[in-house]
Protein backbone atom coordinates (compact mmCIF):
# COMPACT_ATOMS: atom_id res chain seq x y z
CA UNK A 1 0.00 0.00 0.00
CA UNK A 2 0.96 3.64 -0.34
CA UNK A 3 2.72 5.40 2.57
CA UNK A 4 3.60 9.10 2.65
CA UNK A 5 6.66 10.00 4.74
CA UNK A 6 6.77 13.64 5.83
CA UNK A 7 10.39 14.75 6.05
CA UNK A 8 13.62 14.01 4.17
CA UNK A 9 16.11 14.22 7.01
CA UNK A 10 18.02 11.13 8.04
CA UNK A 11 15.07 9.72 10.01
CA UNK A 12 12.56 10.33 7.21
CA UNK A 13 14.79 8.89 4.49
CA UNK A 14 15.62 5.84 6.64
CA UNK A 15 11.90 5.33 7.23
CA UNK A 16 11.24 5.50 3.50
CA UNK A 17 14.05 3.04 2.74
CA UNK A 18 12.87 0.37 5.17
CA UNK A 19 9.22 0.80 4.21
CA UNK A 20 10.15 0.29 0.57
CA UNK A 21 12.19 -2.78 1.49
CA UNK A 22 9.04 -4.14 3.16
CA UNK A 23 7.14 -3.81 -0.10
CA UNK A 24 5.26 -0.56 0.37
CA UNK A 25 4.81 2.17 -2.21
CA UNK A 26 6.45 5.23 -0.64
CA UNK A 27 6.35 8.97 -1.28
CA UNK A 28 8.56 11.40 0.67
CA UNK A 29 7.49 15.04 0.96
CA UNK A 30 9.76 17.90 2.04
CA UNK A 31 9.93 21.67 1.57
CA UNK A 32 13.68 21.63 0.89
CA UNK A 33 15.20 21.06 -2.59
CA UNK A 34 16.97 17.89 -1.44
CA UNK A 35 17.54 15.51 1.47
CA UNK A 36 19.30 16.33 4.76
CA UNK A 37 19.37 20.10 4.31
CA UNK A 38 18.22 21.09 7.80
CA UNK A 39 18.98 19.28 11.08
CA UNK A 40 20.79 16.40 9.33
CA UNK A 41 23.08 18.72 7.35
CA UNK A 42 26.04 19.22 9.69
CA UNK A 43 25.55 17.41 12.97
CA UNK A 44 28.38 16.14 15.15
CA UNK A 45 28.79 13.00 13.02
CA UNK A 46 28.87 10.48 15.85
CA UNK A 47 27.00 7.18 16.06
CA UNK A 48 27.29 6.62 19.79
CA UNK A 49 24.77 4.16 21.26
CA UNK A 50 26.50 3.87 24.62
CA UNK A 51 26.48 7.62 25.11
CA UNK A 52 22.79 7.86 24.27
CA UNK A 53 21.46 9.70 27.30
CA UNK A 54 18.81 12.31 28.06
CA UNK A 55 19.70 15.92 28.78
CA UNK A 56 17.24 15.55 31.64
CA UNK A 57 19.59 14.16 34.29
CA UNK A 58 20.19 14.48 38.03
CA UNK A 59 21.91 17.76 38.81
CA UNK A 60 21.00 19.46 35.54
CA UNK A 61 18.58 22.02 37.08
CA UNK A 62 21.32 23.34 39.41
CA UNK A 63 23.90 23.19 36.63
CA UNK A 64 21.58 25.17 34.37
CA UNK A 65 21.54 28.01 36.90
CA UNK A 66 25.34 27.95 37.10
CA UNK A 67 25.67 27.83 33.31
CA UNK A 68 23.66 31.05 33.02
CA UNK A 69 26.74 32.93 34.22
CA UNK A 70 29.35 31.06 32.15
CA UNK A 71 30.67 32.22 28.81
CA UNK A 72 31.15 28.70 27.41
CA UNK A 73 28.10 27.03 28.93
CA UNK A 74 26.76 23.90 27.17
CA UNK A 75 23.12 24.89 27.81
CA UNK A 76 21.41 28.26 27.41
CA UNK A 77 17.77 29.18 27.99
CA UNK A 78 15.88 32.18 26.66
CA UNK A 79 12.34 32.31 28.02
CA UNK A 80 9.76 33.41 25.47
CA UNK A 81 6.72 33.05 27.73
CA UNK A 82 4.94 30.58 25.46
CA UNK A 83 2.91 27.84 27.09
CA UNK A 84 4.62 25.27 24.86
CA UNK A 85 8.10 26.18 26.05
CA UNK A 86 7.16 26.41 29.73
CA UNK A 87 5.25 23.11 29.68
CA UNK A 88 8.13 21.36 27.90
CA UNK A 89 10.67 22.67 30.41
CA UNK A 90 8.47 21.56 33.31
CA UNK A 91 8.15 18.08 31.79
CA UNK A 92 11.92 17.94 31.33
CA UNK A 93 12.47 19.05 34.93
CA UNK A 94 10.29 16.18 36.15
CA UNK A 95 12.66 13.75 34.40
CA UNK A 96 15.77 15.10 36.15
CA UNK A 97 15.97 12.43 38.83
CA UNK A 98 17.91 9.18 38.99
CA UNK A 99 14.94 6.86 38.44
CA UNK A 100 13.75 8.62 35.29
CA UNK A 101 17.30 9.10 34.04
CA UNK A 102 18.10 5.39 34.27
CA UNK A 103 14.80 4.44 32.66
CA UNK A 104 15.18 6.92 29.81
CA UNK A 105 18.83 6.15 29.17
CA UNK A 106 18.10 2.42 29.16
CA UNK A 107 15.54 2.61 26.37
CA UNK A 108 17.62 5.13 24.43
CA UNK A 109 20.65 2.82 24.54
CA UNK A 110 18.45 -0.12 23.51
CA UNK A 111 17.21 1.66 20.39
CA UNK A 112 20.63 3.14 19.60
CA UNK A 113 22.40 -0.24 19.86
CA UNK A 114 19.79 -1.79 17.58
CA UNK A 115 20.16 1.11 15.16
CA UNK A 116 23.92 0.64 14.93
CA UNK A 117 23.32 -3.02 14.08
CA UNK A 118 20.81 -2.00 11.39
CA UNK A 119 23.32 0.46 9.95
CA UNK A 120 25.97 -2.26 9.85
CA UNK A 121 23.59 -4.61 8.03
CA UNK A 122 22.67 -1.86 5.58
CA UNK A 123 26.32 -1.08 4.94
CA UNK A 124 27.11 -4.73 4.31
CA UNK A 125 24.13 -5.31 2.01
CA UNK A 126 24.43 -2.14 -0.07
CA UNK A 127 28.04 -0.97 0.23
CA UNK A 128 26.88 2.57 1.04
CA UNK A 129 29.80 4.95 1.69
CA UNK A 130 29.60 8.03 3.93
CA UNK A 131 33.13 8.61 5.29
CA UNK A 132 32.28 6.17 8.05
CA UNK A 133 34.71 4.92 10.67
CA UNK A 134 34.34 2.21 13.29
CA UNK A 135 36.92 3.53 15.75
CA UNK A 136 34.78 3.96 18.84
CA UNK A 137 34.05 7.02 20.96
CA UNK A 138 36.00 8.49 23.87
CA UNK A 139 34.32 10.63 26.53
CA UNK A 140 36.83 12.96 28.18
CA UNK A 141 36.72 14.03 31.82
CA UNK A 142 38.35 17.23 33.08
CA UNK A 143 37.56 16.76 36.79
CA UNK A 144 37.78 13.92 39.29
CA UNK A 145 34.06 14.33 39.97
CA UNK A 146 33.23 13.63 36.33
CA UNK A 147 35.43 10.54 36.43
CA UNK A 148 33.66 9.26 39.54
CA UNK A 149 30.20 10.07 38.14
CA UNK A 150 30.87 7.75 35.20
CA UNK A 151 29.80 4.86 37.42
CA UNK A 152 26.14 5.78 36.91
CA UNK A 153 26.41 5.45 33.13
CA UNK A 154 28.59 2.35 33.42
CA UNK A 155 25.76 0.63 35.32
CA UNK A 156 23.45 1.14 32.33
CA UNK A 157 26.15 0.02 29.88
CA UNK A 158 26.69 -3.17 31.86
CA UNK A 159 22.96 -3.90 32.02
CA UNK A 160 22.68 -3.47 28.23
CA UNK A 161 25.83 -5.50 27.52
CA UNK A 162 27.72 -2.56 25.98
CA UNK A 163 31.54 -2.99 25.97
CA UNK A 164 33.51 -0.13 27.58
CA UNK A 165 36.89 0.85 29.02
CA UNK A 166 37.41 3.34 31.84
CA UNK A 167 40.77 5.01 31.23
CA UNK A 168 43.11 7.13 33.32
CA UNK A 169 44.57 10.30 31.78
CA UNK A 170 47.87 8.59 30.95
CA UNK A 171 46.00 5.92 28.94
CA UNK A 172 44.01 8.28 26.70
CA UNK A 173 46.74 8.50 24.05
CA UNK A 174 46.39 4.75 23.48
CA UNK A 175 43.03 5.53 21.91
CA UNK A 176 43.59 9.07 20.60
CA UNK A 177 47.35 9.64 20.10
CA UNK A 178 47.05 13.42 19.65
CA UNK A 179 45.74 13.73 23.22
CA UNK A 180 49.22 12.94 24.53
CA UNK A 181 49.96 16.66 24.23
CA UNK A 182 47.07 17.66 26.52
CA UNK A 183 46.69 14.69 28.90
CA UNK A 184 47.72 16.88 31.84
CA UNK A 185 44.44 18.81 31.43
CA UNK A 186 42.33 15.66 31.77
CA UNK A 187 41.50 13.18 34.52
CA UNK A 188 40.50 10.25 32.34
CA UNK A 189 37.94 8.98 29.89
CA UNK A 190 35.29 6.40 29.09
CA UNK A 191 35.81 4.58 25.81
CA UNK A 192 33.11 2.71 23.90
CA UNK A 193 35.01 0.73 21.24
CA UNK A 194 31.93 -0.30 19.23
CA UNK A 195 30.74 3.23 18.43
CA UNK A 196 31.04 4.67 14.93
CA UNK A 197 31.25 7.96 13.06
CA UNK A 198 30.20 9.24 9.66
CA UNK A 199 28.88 12.15 7.63
CA UNK A 200 25.13 12.12 8.23
CA UNK A 201 24.30 14.36 5.27
CA UNK A 202 26.38 12.25 2.89
CA UNK A 203 24.74 9.08 4.20
CA UNK A 204 21.23 10.51 3.88
CA UNK A 205 21.87 11.81 0.37
CA UNK A 206 23.18 8.46 -0.83
CA UNK A 207 20.44 6.49 0.90
CA UNK A 208 17.86 8.76 -0.73
CA UNK A 209 19.44 8.04 -4.12
CA UNK A 210 19.28 4.31 -3.42
CA UNK A 211 15.68 4.61 -2.24
CA UNK A 212 14.71 6.52 -5.37
CA UNK A 213 16.35 3.85 -7.53
CA UNK A 214 14.28 1.28 -5.61
CA UNK A 215 11.06 3.12 -6.45
CA UNK A 216 10.56 5.70 -3.68
CA UNK A 217 9.14 8.98 -5.00
CA UNK A 218 10.65 12.18 -3.55
CA UNK A 219 8.56 15.35 -3.67
CA UNK A 220 11.08 18.07 -2.87
CA UNK A 221 10.26 21.81 -2.88
CA UNK A 222 6.82 20.86 -1.55
CA UNK A 223 5.86 22.71 1.65
CA UNK A 224 3.15 21.01 3.70
CA UNK A 225 0.32 23.19 4.99
CA UNK A 226 -1.45 20.64 7.18
CA UNK A 227 -2.74 17.11 7.57
CA UNK A 228 -6.38 16.50 6.67
CA UNK A 229 -8.31 14.24 9.00
CA UNK A 230 -11.78 12.83 9.43
CA UNK A 231 -12.75 10.73 12.41
CA UNK A 232 -9.77 8.58 13.35
CA UNK A 233 -8.11 8.64 9.95
CA UNK A 234 -5.86 10.96 7.96
CA UNK A 235 -7.15 11.31 4.42
CA UNK A 236 -4.58 13.62 2.86
CA UNK A 237 -1.72 16.09 3.07
CA UNK A 238 -2.50 19.61 1.89
CA UNK A 239 0.40 21.13 -0.04
CA UNK A 240 -0.69 24.46 -1.49
CA UNK A 241 -3.50 23.77 -3.95
CA UNK A 242 -2.70 20.05 -4.03
CA UNK A 243 -3.90 17.29 -1.72
CA UNK A 244 -1.61 14.25 -1.66
CA UNK A 245 -3.42 11.10 -0.57
CA UNK A 246 -2.13 7.74 0.63
CA UNK A 247 -3.13 4.77 2.75
CA UNK A 248 -0.76 5.63 5.59
CA UNK A 249 1.26 8.62 6.82
CA UNK A 250 4.52 8.88 8.77
CA UNK A 251 5.40 12.09 10.61
CA UNK A 252 9.17 12.67 10.49
CA UNK A 253 9.29 16.46 10.42
CA UNK A 254 11.64 16.73 13.38
CA UNK A 255 11.14 19.94 15.35
CA UNK A 256 8.19 20.92 13.18
CA UNK A 257 6.23 17.75 14.00
CA UNK A 258 4.42 19.25 17.00
CA UNK A 259 2.97 22.18 15.07
CA UNK A 260 2.03 20.00 12.10
CA UNK A 261 0.17 17.58 14.39
CA UNK A 262 -1.70 20.27 16.33
CA UNK A 263 -5.30 19.24 16.83
CA UNK A 264 -4.49 15.66 15.80
CA UNK A 265 -1.87 14.26 18.18
CA UNK A 266 -0.27 16.15 21.05
CA UNK A 267 3.47 15.44 21.23
CA UNK A 268 6.04 17.49 23.21
CA UNK A 269 8.81 17.79 20.60
CA UNK A 270 10.75 21.03 21.09
CA UNK A 271 13.52 22.55 18.91
CA UNK A 272 16.83 22.30 20.77
CA UNK A 273 19.27 24.55 18.93
CA UNK A 274 22.80 23.31 18.36
CA UNK A 275 25.91 24.43 16.49
CA UNK A 276 28.81 22.92 14.59
CA UNK A 277 32.07 23.77 12.87
CA UNK A 278 33.50 21.85 9.92
CA UNK A 279 37.28 22.25 9.78
CA UNK A 280 39.80 21.11 7.13
CA UNK A 281 42.53 18.93 8.65
CA UNK A 282 45.92 20.63 8.95
CA UNK A 283 48.06 17.94 10.58
CA UNK A 284 47.10 14.25 10.53
CA UNK A 285 49.13 13.51 13.65
CA UNK A 286 47.35 16.28 15.55
CA UNK A 287 43.81 15.34 14.49
CA UNK A 288 41.36 12.97 16.17
CA UNK A 289 41.16 9.35 15.04
CA UNK A 290 37.44 8.94 15.71
CA UNK A 291 35.13 10.88 18.07
CA UNK A 292 35.85 12.44 21.44
CA UNK A 293 33.21 13.95 23.72
CA UNK A 294 34.18 16.75 26.08
CA UNK A 295 32.05 16.09 29.16
CA UNK A 296 32.54 19.60 30.55
CA UNK A 297 31.35 21.50 27.50
CA UNK A 298 29.12 18.76 26.00
CA UNK A 299 30.94 19.09 22.69
CA UNK A 300 31.86 16.30 20.26
CA UNK A 301 34.90 16.38 17.98
CA UNK A 302 34.64 13.90 15.11
CA UNK A 303 37.01 12.83 12.37
CA UNK A 304 35.83 12.49 8.76
CA UNK A 305 38.22 11.74 5.87
CA UNK A 306 39.80 15.17 5.48
CA UNK A 307 37.68 17.19 7.89
CA UNK A 308 36.98 17.60 11.58
CA UNK A 309 33.40 18.19 12.73
CA UNK A 310 32.97 19.97 16.06
CA UNK A 311 29.40 20.02 17.34
CA UNK A 312 27.40 20.56 20.47
CA UNK A 313 25.68 22.92 22.88
CA UNK A 314 21.97 23.27 23.44
CA UNK A 315 19.83 26.39 23.42
CA UNK A 316 16.19 26.44 24.43
CA UNK A 317 15.28 29.45 22.29
CA UNK A 318 12.42 28.28 20.10
CA UNK A 319 12.87 28.29 16.33
CA UNK A 320 15.64 30.89 16.30
CA UNK A 321 18.34 29.89 13.76
CA UNK A 322 20.62 32.91 14.13
CA UNK A 323 24.33 32.07 14.07
CA UNK A 324 25.78 33.52 17.28
CA UNK A 325 29.46 34.45 17.37
CA UNK A 326 29.94 33.47 21.05
CA UNK A 327 28.86 29.90 20.21
CA UNK A 328 31.42 29.74 17.43
CA UNK A 329 34.06 30.93 19.87
CA UNK A 330 33.12 28.15 22.31
CA UNK A 331 33.49 25.46 19.64
CA UNK A 332 36.81 26.95 18.54
CA UNK A 333 38.03 27.14 22.14
CA UNK A 334 37.36 23.45 22.80
CA UNK A 335 38.95 22.15 19.60
CA UNK A 336 42.00 24.41 20.07
CA UNK A 337 42.34 23.17 23.63
CA UNK A 338 42.22 19.46 22.78
CA UNK A 339 43.63 19.38 19.23
CA UNK A 340 45.71 22.56 18.79
CA UNK A 341 47.52 21.18 15.72
CA UNK A 342 44.57 19.38 14.17
CA UNK A 343 42.79 21.74 11.81
CA UNK A 344 42.69 25.01 9.88
CA UNK A 345 40.23 26.68 12.24
CA UNK A 346 40.39 29.92 10.28
CA UNK A 347 38.72 28.05 7.38
CA UNK A 348 35.91 26.55 9.49
CA UNK A 349 32.30 26.54 8.28
CA UNK A 350 29.86 27.55 11.02
CA UNK A 351 26.37 26.00 11.12
CA UNK A 352 23.30 25.74 13.32
CA UNK A 353 20.35 23.36 13.40
CA UNK A 354 17.27 22.54 15.46
CA UNK A 355 17.21 19.12 17.12
CA UNK A 356 13.73 17.73 17.84
CA UNK A 357 13.85 16.95 21.55
CA UNK A 358 11.33 15.32 23.87
CA UNK A 359 11.38 16.15 27.61
CA UNK A 360 12.63 12.66 28.49
CA UNK A 361 15.12 12.44 25.61
CA UNK A 362 13.52 9.33 24.10
CA UNK A 363 12.12 9.63 20.56
CA UNK A 364 8.47 9.01 19.73
CA UNK A 365 8.25 6.01 17.41
CA UNK A 366 5.12 4.05 16.58
CA UNK A 367 1.42 4.30 15.99
CA UNK A 368 -1.11 6.87 17.19
CA UNK A 369 -4.83 6.79 17.93
CA UNK A 370 -5.34 7.58 14.27
CA UNK A 371 -5.53 4.29 12.39
CA UNK A 372 -3.19 5.31 9.57
CA UNK A 373 -0.81 7.80 11.22
CA UNK A 374 2.57 6.83 12.64
CA UNK A 375 5.30 8.89 14.29
CA UNK A 376 9.08 8.80 13.91
CA UNK A 377 10.30 11.99 15.50
CA UNK A 378 11.80 13.53 18.64
CA UNK A 379 15.28 12.00 18.38
CA UNK A 380 16.97 15.12 19.75
CA UNK A 381 20.75 15.06 19.35
CA UNK A 382 20.69 11.36 18.39
CA UNK A 383 18.88 11.32 15.05
CA UNK A 384 21.95 10.00 13.23
CA UNK A 385 22.62 7.42 15.94
CA UNK A 386 19.02 6.15 15.97
CA UNK A 387 17.85 6.66 12.37
CA UNK A 388 18.28 3.19 10.89
CA UNK A 389 16.91 1.40 13.93
CA UNK A 390 13.93 3.75 14.11
CA UNK A 391 13.24 3.29 10.40
CA UNK A 392 13.40 -0.50 10.59
CA UNK A 393 11.33 -0.56 13.77
CA UNK A 394 8.63 1.64 12.27
CA UNK A 395 8.53 -0.42 9.08
CA UNK A 396 8.03 -3.58 11.14
CA UNK A 397 5.23 -1.98 13.17
CA UNK A 398 3.42 -0.71 10.07
CA UNK A 399 3.86 -4.02 8.25
CA UNK A 400 2.54 -6.10 11.13
CA UNK A 401 5.86 -7.78 11.84
CA UNK A 402 7.23 -8.44 15.31
CA UNK A 403 10.04 -5.90 15.90
CA UNK A 404 13.44 -7.16 17.01
CA UNK A 405 13.42 -5.02 20.18
CA UNK A 406 10.81 -3.95 22.76
CA UNK A 407 9.14 -0.82 21.44
CA UNK A 408 6.01 0.03 23.39
CA UNK A 409 7.87 2.43 25.71
CA UNK A 410 8.98 4.42 22.65
CA UNK A 411 5.42 5.29 21.64
CA UNK A 412 3.42 8.45 22.21
CA UNK A 413 1.54 6.57 24.95
CA UNK A 414 3.86 7.95 27.63
CA UNK A 415 2.49 11.41 26.84
CA UNK A 416 -1.09 10.30 26.13
CA UNK A 417 -2.85 8.80 29.17
CA UNK A 418 -5.30 6.10 28.19
CA UNK A 419 -3.65 5.32 24.85
CA UNK A 420 -2.34 1.76 24.43
CA UNK A 421 0.28 1.19 21.71
CA UNK A 422 0.08 -2.61 21.68
CA UNK A 423 -2.92 -3.07 19.38
CA UNK A 424 -1.29 -2.39 16.04
CA UNK A 425 -2.90 -1.22 12.83
CA UNK A 426 -1.30 -3.06 9.95
CA UNK A 427 -1.27 -1.73 6.42
CA UNK A 428 -2.22 -4.40 3.92
CA UNK A 429 -0.05 -4.90 0.88
CA UNK A 430 3.32 -5.34 2.55
CA UNK A 431 5.39 -8.45 2.30
CA UNK A 432 4.82 -10.71 5.35
Curated annotation (Swiss-Prot):
It is an enzyme of class 1 (oxidoreductase). SUPFAM superfamilies: FAD-linked reductases, C-terminal domain, FAD/NAD(P)-binding domain. It catalyses: a D-alpha-amino acid + A + H2O = a 2-oxocarboxylate + AH2 + NH4(+). Signal peptide: none annotated. Gene3D superfamilies: D-Amino Acid Oxidase, subunit A, domain 2 (3.30.9.10), FAD/NAD(P)-binding domain (3.50.50.60). GO terms for biological process: D-alanine catabolic process. It comes from the Bacteria. Its EC number is 1.4.99.-. InterPro entries: DadA, FAD-dep_OxRdtase, FAD/NAD-bd_sf. FAD binds at residues 3-17. One of its GO terms (cellular component) is plasma membrane. Keywords: FAD, Flavoprotein, Oxidoreductase. Its cofactor is FAD. The keyword S-adenosyl-L-methionine does not apply. Pathway: Amino-acid degradation; D-alanine degradation; NH(3) and pyruvate from D-alanine: step 1/1. One of its GO terms (molecular function) is D-amino-acid dehydrogenase activity. Oxidative deamination of D-amino acids. Belongs to the DadA oxidoreductase family. This is D-amino acid dehydrogenase. It comes from Cronobacter sakazakii (strain ATCC BAA-894) (Enterobacter sakazakii).
Amino acid sequence: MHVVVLGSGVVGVASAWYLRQAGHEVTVIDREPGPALETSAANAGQISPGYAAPWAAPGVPLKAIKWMFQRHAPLAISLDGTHFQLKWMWQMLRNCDTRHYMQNKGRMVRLAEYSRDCLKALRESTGIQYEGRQGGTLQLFRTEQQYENASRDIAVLESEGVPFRLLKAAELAQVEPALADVAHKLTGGLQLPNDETGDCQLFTTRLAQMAEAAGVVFRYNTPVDRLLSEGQRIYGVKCGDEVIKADGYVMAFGSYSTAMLKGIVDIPVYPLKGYSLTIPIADESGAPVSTVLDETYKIAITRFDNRIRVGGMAEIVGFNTELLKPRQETLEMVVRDLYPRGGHIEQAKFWTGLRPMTPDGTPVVGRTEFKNLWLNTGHGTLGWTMACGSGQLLSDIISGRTPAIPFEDLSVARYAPGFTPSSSHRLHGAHP
